[in-house]
Amino acid sequence: MPILLTERLELVPVTIAVVEAVLAGDRARVEGLVNARCPVSWPNRALIERAFYADIEAIKQDPIRRLWGDRVMITRDSSRRVVGSVVFHGAPGDDGEVEVAYGVEEESQRQGYATEATRVSVDWALAHEGVSVVRA
């Protein structure tokens, strides 16, 4: 899955290794894997409960479907900060629909990051064969 770029953001694909580090609460490992600084409050239990609808074993059994389109939002400036994530709730179904969601850390809200990340993610999804509708 490619990295997506916007004017201010780099959207880095979520991998099983990132999921495992988040679930373990291993901030240093997450930072190393995504090559960016995480907020002090990240990862935390609330993030884990919001972000992962499936358990790690389900993700490992079908990572392509479970992590389809999921990316971490990282600022492209010199600070390289994780400001949130944009995720799809799985790969497209037979009906051609996918559902997108996002989360932005509190200190980075109201700066347009979610709009920017969601736009490029929706464009990416709609460019895939079999995707006809993106719901939010």
Show where each model-derived region lies.
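GNAT-family acyltransferases
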Residues: 1-99, 104-107, 120-124, 128, ...
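Glycine-rich acyl-CoA binding loop
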Residues: 110-115
